[in-house]
Amino acid sequence: TTTMEVGDCVLLVEAYQKPAFIGAGGLWAGLTQAQINARKAAINGHPDQSACHAWVNAFGSNGKAGVYFQRFVGNGTTGAILQSPNPTNNCELPSSAVYDPTRPETFHLPRCNAWNWAVNIWGTVPGSVAAQDTRDNVGVQYGLKALRDGVIGAEEFVTLNELVGGIDRDSNPRAQRSTADLGALETAYRSGIVASGRQLARMAIIDLRGWDDSNVTVPPGLNPPGAPIHHQWFSWAVRDRIVAESAAGDARNQALWRFARTGLAAPGTLGLEAF
C-alpha cells in the first residue's frame, strides 16, 4: 500500500507544474513560493513539499516498464521537473535487450517494472506478457481535505482533479485515471501483501520510528534527511487498521516508540532503554 503514496506523489508533482497552476494567468500566478508550497503540503498531506519530491526521485520510476527517460524533481523549492536525455531501464540491461514502448517488435522482451518483477504473484494480462496491476485512483478526490480546511479554493480543487489523471500499466501518464486489474487486487488482499488489521492484532508490535518526514521542516538540532520517505503517518495508518479490523476494536497490542533527535536511525542507547 506504500505504492499508493508513491504513485499519487508522481501524479501530483507533475500536475503542479502544469500551466494551469504556474503559467502566466495560472491559478498560482502572483503567489509567493511559500504560499504555493503551503498549498502543495496541504494537498499532499505532508509537512511540506519535500516528502513527495523524495518519493518521486527515489521510487517514482520503479513502475516504468522497459526503456524510459527518467523524470525527477530538480529543484526542491519549486518542484521543477527535469528529464534525463539518456534512456534507461530497470532491468539494468542494454536498451536493445528490453521492452521499448516505441518499438512493438520488443513487446515480448523483459519489462522489469515493479509489477513484472513479481509476475509470478500477480499473473499476466490475458494475451500479454505484462503483469496485472494493482494501481488505481478512480474516484480519488485529491486535495479534498485542503479544500475543506480552506487552504485551497474550489477552482484549484477542480482543476487539480481534472489535470492529475493517471498512468497506464507501463507508467506512462494519461488523462484518464489509473485502473487496477481485479485479479491483482484479489491477490494483494488474499496473500497478505495488503496487511490485515485482524491478523496484525494477534501479535505484539513495537513500532520504532525516527524523524524522516521532511528535509525542510525538521526538529531542532537534526540534520535534514536526504530523502524523507519514512513518514509518521504510516504508524497511525497501521493502528487505525488494527482498531477497525480487530475483534477487540482497539490497538493495545501496538506500542509506538519515537526518537526524533537522531533522525531515521535509532540512537545508540536504544538497546539499553528497551530494558
Regions found by a protein language model. Name each.
Residues 1-275:
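C-terminal His-loop and adjacent cap/lid subdomain of alpha/beta-hydrolase
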